[in-house]
């Protein structure tokens, strides 16, 4: 079949199971080949081929609503809804998004980049449906990794209480990104081994219906027998107690089982949970045999060998450098512990976990719990390193404020993927953390200019005992700078001048330092002497240096790879205002007030104007007339 010619899923209605099985194989081959060039979330999508096809055959999208959670398992859905020709642009600038995108297709009714949101969204859609009196099916498809998120459990509780008609598909592949952890995952394991429960339950109900109505005592006894047998067969029927009709577990790669259970679910009133067992990476051996999450999402790879295609890095990854330094310091201080919300591989904590298993805590997709747990450990004298992506730190905001900062707990928050992250797009860009952290009392916030300074900042953070401290660091690799042999402690709230200058000042930090230095070098050739300051402490700022700069009256340009609204530049404007320096020319460069979509970081920086050329232009515009040739008259 020509997969690129698919316009919508209606063609599936006429296909036999044998034809669907052939289609499954074709789709897997297409995904393996296509993603070998572009990269993407291959593991999750190879696992949901049959499930996605079965859903589109059995239901009528977009009238019936599919909510994919997490959204990276929606590639087959995209293919079946007419986007095959766009797969060569997957996750590229102006190309096909790697997550559901409402502006892409009417079949994408809910956008998910962060996990555990589908059930709440589905509850909202079901409530709206019932108010309007329409009849569509609402079908959230949630991976059991996403089910460990507290938000999903809150929604399960509410859905069961409201008894809304809904079919929840639990896509249980035993993994989220890394292997799942926690009691819920263990419970699902017990359910997998108790597949006879549904059959026994149905037989019991049939027999009980045939018992003559001889009084309440016998009926009550029968109910107790049924309940006792239920708990004997399946320890803790969690979903049924919440008010769901539980179906499964069923083989997620068997069309016979999928159709039988989907048809039963459609006829059942109230919320239904269909527990589907799938194999992550099915059909591609390197992905099938992955046990730690390497093949969850990848870059390009060689199909025949499974080797990843990537240039040899000239420097270590930022995640590896930070976690490696934490691990190094943990050898000397047994109070240091590491906490991650389901990202041990991405945060490069495998080495720490292997060396210090008793001090490593992967709490699952539970950012709020991770933050508050870190506070609890800190208040008992430990030194917790909370490794968390910038985009996921958003989910723990109240815990950072209420539990960490308000209690002045000595927690080191390692904010990974700070700044633009590229291909994962607007749900994952790490651009909001400065704005939502810099105003919180007690918190220190910093970002290094390179990996050498990064190691010193990790050392500073784990030796800081005055309260919480956070370090931002970007996705990708360092610059390959020379590393100091000895770790140092950087005085809190101090900046450094990287390049002297007497005509203007650039204040920046982190990934934009290199661009600022290059711009200053070019401006020097045009007769402008521009000072470049490494404003490595975003909070507290170096007030002594800042006051001196303001007293000089020099034009100031702030640059940050973060949102301008409430960001570092706003801090400088506020400080200048507080000192009464109303006439100092100050300009700001950063992320504009909109969500930044997917694409290479280079392309995105060009689009939003965070470039060397624009830095030079902004400096020239700040200068008074006649300071620079060609400006003024």
UniProtKB/Swiss-Prot annotation:
SUPFAM superfamilies referenced in this protein's UniProt entry, alphabetically: Thiamin diphosphate-binding fold (THDP-binding), TK C-terminal domain-like
Keyword vocabulary terms for this entry: Isoprene biosynthesis, Magnesium, Metal-binding, Thiamine biosynthesis, Thiamine pyrophosphate, Transferase
A GO molecular-function descriptor: magnesium ion binding
Enzyme Commission code: 2.2.1.7
The protein's required cofactors: Mg(2+); thiamine diphosphate
Residues reported to bind thiamine diphosphate: 72, 113-115, 145-146, 173, 284, 367
Metabolic or biological pathway, per its Swiss-Prot or TrEMBL entry: Metabolic intermediate biosynthesis; 1-deoxy-D-xylulose 5-phosphate biosynthesis; 1-deoxy-D-xylulose 5-phosphate from D-glyceraldehyde 3-phosphate and pyruvate: step 1/1
One GO location term (cellular component): cytosol
NCBIfam families in alphabetical order: dxs, PRK05444.2-2
Subunit note: Homodimer.
Family, as annotated: Belongs to the transketolase family. DXPS subfamily.
Name of the protein in its database record: 1-deoxy-D-xylulose-5-phosphate synthase
Source organism of this protein record: Bacillus velezensis (strain DSM 23117 / BGSC 10A6 / LMG 26770 / FZB42)
